[in-house]
């Protein structure tokens, strides 16, 4: 890429919206396909100590975000719903005392459909959670067993019904291209999810990630590429036919029900990440900084009790890397983003990367409208090829 230089300090005329990500790293059992920072429960759940550590972590970051309003919060994992509602309440009370949390903030918590967690849903709402994201993956018990999940289809339906009674917004996570899955069995999952009345459905292609059991030994019966593409087309078509807007690579929402937290990621907004292994991105007038917390929960807890600053690594994003990082997020959105947002969020005018933009357009991967960066249908299908234009 052509060498890019920032203007002098003050290149960002305004800071982007700010979100808060909170990582809860424990699960009852780690799934064989999962490459997230999650750890199986072995010796009990150190809830009180971890909440204390999260609040210490947040206090550590206050000078870097002082006075900025927080638009959304997302509890991810791991399985955040393993924590008691009282713990989530204590944490959110601490967050409110430390940050300018917007009155209409979206506050999402990831939950598993086991009956143990369902009993807590009312408590989560009372604590201030406004949206649940339920990790269903499939309603088919055979598929769930192959994926190593600890719930069954009936429990998933009960969890969703309970969530929708309590929350205006609820997401269902589904996976497709599963072992021995056909177009019809994939559609059965999608139609079941649609029938629940969920406002948002995330549909993810099962991938064999390195350093996971499935990555080392893929399960038998995985659909071949062409069959997997047929399944994907059927899944997407069914969701769109039911009135869901396909607004991001894997995300479908009823009108006005998009996940605001994830939209902020994809629009290259800022997010403070706290908790074991959490990543963050914070903009300053003269630079953009990425952060990552110590990954293992035991190490994170120990450092937060003794030397909190040593639990955090900080790195300024090189100016020449910013266009790719911006596009890597923005081009996941079906409608793309306004072209002016590149300069607003990175300080780099589009003119600096016009050669790369023109290459993407000539390949038919990026629309030619100069006011927007929007992938074509071909660009959405071959997103990696589109992103390669900006490397």
Name each region found by the language model:
Residues 4, 10-19, 38-64, 68-348:
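C-terminal scaffold of the Radical SAM
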Residues 20-24:
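Short active-site neighborhood of thiol/selenol oxidoreductases, capturing the structured segment around
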Residues 25-38:
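Local cysteine-cluster metal-coordination motifs and their immediate loop/turn environment
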Residues 252, 370-373:
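Short, Lys/Arg-rich nucleic-acid/phosphate-binding segment
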Residues 347-359:
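Short amphipathic alpha-helical interaction segments
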Residues 362-371:
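A short, conserved structural fragment
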Residues 373-380:
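Basic, amphipathic "hinge/linker" alpha-helix immediately C-terminal to the N-terminal HTH DNA-binding motif
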Residues 380-391:
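Short, amphipathic alpha-helical interaction segments positioned at domain boundaries
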């Amino acid at each position: 890429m052509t060498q890019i230089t920032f203007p002098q300090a003050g290149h960002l005329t305004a800071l982007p919206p700010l979100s808060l990500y909170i990582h809860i790293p424990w699960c009852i059992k780690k799934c064989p396909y999962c490459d997230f920072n999650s750890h199986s429960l072995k010796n009990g759940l150190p809830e009180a100590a971890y909440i204390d550590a999260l609040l210490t972590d947040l206090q550590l970051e206050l000078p870097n975000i002082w006075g900025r309003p927080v638009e959304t919060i997302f509890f991810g994992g791991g399985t955040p719903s393993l924590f008691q509602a009282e713990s989530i309440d204590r944490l959110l009370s601490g967050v409110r005392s430390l940050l300018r949390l917007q009155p209409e903030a979206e506050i999402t918590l990831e939950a598993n459909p086991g009956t143990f967690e369902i009993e807590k849903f009312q408590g989560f709402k009372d604590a201030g959670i406004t949206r649940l994201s339920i990790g269903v993956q499939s309603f088919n018990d055979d598929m769930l067993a192959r994926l190593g999940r600890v719930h069954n289809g009936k429990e998933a339906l009960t969890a969703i019904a309970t969530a929708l009674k309590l929350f205006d917004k609820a997401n269902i996570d589904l996976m497709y291209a599963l072992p021995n899955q056909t177009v019809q069995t994939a559609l059965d999952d999608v139609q079941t999810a649609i029938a629940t009345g969920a406002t948002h459905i995330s549909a993810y292609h099962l991938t064999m990630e390195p350093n996971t059991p499935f990555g080392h030994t893929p399960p038998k019966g995985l659909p071949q590429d062409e069959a997997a593409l047929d399944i994907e087309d059927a899944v997407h078509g069914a969701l769109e036919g039911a009135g869901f807007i396909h607004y991001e690579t894997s995300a479908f929402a009823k009108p006005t029900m998009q996940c605001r937290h994830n939209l902020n990621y994809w629009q290259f907004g800022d997010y403070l990440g706290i908790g074991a292994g959490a990543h963050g991105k914070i903009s300053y007038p003269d630079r953009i900084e990425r952060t990552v917390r110590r990954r293992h929960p035991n190490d994170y807890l120990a450092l937060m009790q003794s030397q909190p600053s040593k639990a955090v690594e900080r790195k300024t994003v090189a100016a020449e890397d910013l266009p790719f990082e911006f596009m890597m997020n923005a081009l996941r959105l079906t409608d793309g983003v306004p072209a002016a947002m590149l300069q607003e969020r990175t300080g780099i005018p589009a003119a600096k990367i016009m050669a790369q933009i023109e290459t993407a357009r000539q390949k038919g991967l990026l629309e030619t409208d100069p006011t927007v960066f929007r992938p074509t249908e071909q660009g959405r299908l071959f997103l990696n090829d589109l992103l390669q234009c900006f490397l």
